[in-house]
Amino acid sequence: MANTTSAKKATRKIARRTAINRSRRTLMRGTVRIVEEAIAKGDRDAAIQAMKRAEPELMRAGQQNIIHKNNASRKVSRLTHRIAKLAQ
């Protein structure tokens, strides 16, 4: 348990930030899941539309240190590559 007032404030701040980050991470994972489901079905058009929503979420998560920025770029790259393979 925090004893000093600054430690108590830090605890409140961490709780707020954790809640925000959790919701952003959930949103990001949900958009990626929609893309992966469209790829699994082989629906290229749906995958492209879902990717248009997922890419900004991934990059935003990378900028806000919810995930590492290289991790965000890697996910975007791999999903884009998988969508491109659907066209073949």
UniProtKB/Swiss-Prot annotation:
GO BP field: translation
InterPro entries: Ribosomal_bS20, Ribosomal_bS20_sf
Pfam families associated with the record: Ribosomal_S20p (PF01649)
GO cellular component: cytosol; small ribosomal subunit
Entry annotated with the keyword Ribonucleoprotein: yes
Keyword Ribonucleoprotein tagged: yes
Gene3D superfamilies per record: Ribosomal protein S20 (1.20.58.110)
Keywords associated with the record: Ribonucleoprotein, Ribosomal protein, RNA-binding, rRNA-binding
HAMAP family to which the protein is assigned, alphabetical: Ribosomal_bS20 (MF_00500)
NCBIfam families in the cross-refs: S20
Protein name: Small ribosomal subunit protein bS20
Species name: Nitrobacter winogradskyi (strain ATCC 25391 / DSM 10237 / CIP 104748 / NCIMB 11846 / Nb-255)
